[in-house]
């Protein structure tokens, strides 16, 4: 593929890949191999962009296996080698990002990322319970991220520049969906990731913009499943909990800690049908019922400068909000 940005930079990507899979008794084996090449050329623009010409190319691939322990249970193992070339913005940005009120600087010396990933999974499904556990370990060489600089180029905009370092990411996801009775669902999920920049002092030990540990529980009851006019009618209540995130990239005050918060969300919905065909759907949602003031750790709006009289920096996420959605199916 070829693209051009603002007539100052050009990009050409090309790749080729092959995949295969094989089934043998309880085993399912799969694998893939890919080669990518990216060429970028930046044209000089006086006072803004310097001339740049970079070429990146590398192989990536993966092998995986799934073993069925029983008809309801299986385990999974995958090993992958990854490659990602820096993009145009990471190499040559030089200007204000209006969405985050930041002045972004690229880094023409960035190297491509190379990674190893290992993930192990377990799945179980039965009429009463469905459960899944996934664990992963990533090692990424030359991981690219942006960090805050001390200087200010444009008033009112903090300055960030892309840099890179060697990283290790460990984490996992777990989910349990219980069906104690036919129409009742109790869904639970938890996710966690620990991302560390290797061989760095405490202030820059953790990678920036790492999601906080996240847990959700939803209780859903299907009122009508197969009615003559109403179908898939349900009500639900969900609890969303984001734990405190204190693993931050503190160098240059790039990040700040984010406290924990819990939200309660309610929902209801139904389909309308005639002659056995779905004609329309109606959904009602009420999120953040208790109007909790909170900031998501990944929100870039958390760091915006607001009214000086407000002791809390940044823009908060949405408070209590009620929505109605009506969908008409034409075909």
Model-predicted regions and their roles:
Residues 2-140:
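Structural signature of Gram-negative outer-membrane beta-barrels, strongest in the C-terminal barrel
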Residues 2-8, 43-52, 102-108, 117, ...:
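Extracellular loop and loop/strand-boundary signature of outer-membrane beta-barrel proteins
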Residues 11, 105-111, 117, 126-187, ...:
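Outer membrane beta-barrel strand-and-loop segments of large Gram-negative receptors
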Residues 16-22, 63-67, 120-124, 172-178, ...:
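Residues on the lipid-exposed face of transmembrane beta-strands in outer-membrane beta-barrel proteins
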Residues 25-26, 72, 128-130, 182-183, ...:
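Short loop/turn motifs that connect adjacent beta-strands in outer-membrane beta-barrel proteins
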Residues 83, 139-141, 186, 241-248, ...:
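C-terminal beta-signal and adjacent terminal beta-strands/loops
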Residues 136-139, 157-245:
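Gram-negative outer-membrane beta-barrel transporters
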